Amino acid sequence: MVKKGAMPNFETIDDYIASQPKEAQKVLQELRSIIKEAVPNATELLNYKVPAFTLVKEGKRDQQIMMAAYAKFIGFYPFPTTIEEFSAELKNFKHGKGSVQFPLDKPLPKDLIKRMVKFRRDEILKDWR
């Protein structure tokens, strides 16, 4: 018996997206495309049972960005330093230390997201040197 509210285990990001309401599916697919456009070699996986993208080869958990669907928004988790770097541009979005909420009923800020993803990737690569 599954606990009420327990998140199922998904095999793939496609499974995760397919399990969401139609409105969330559309935004998740769009966000996924934006991430892959920004970093084409990002590896997709599930982490904490939600879609994650490793931005560098064999990247650890803190070298990934994640996304998750909620009732009224998509949570995007690019890392605290990324949120800090783009805080002025995120002023119209609810955001915390390492996350930002993109409402389902508003267009995604495609250019901003691409720049955030590239910033995080470049930050990771710089730390590796």
Per-segment meaning from a language model:
Residues M1-R129:
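Charge-dense, helix-prone N-terminal extensions
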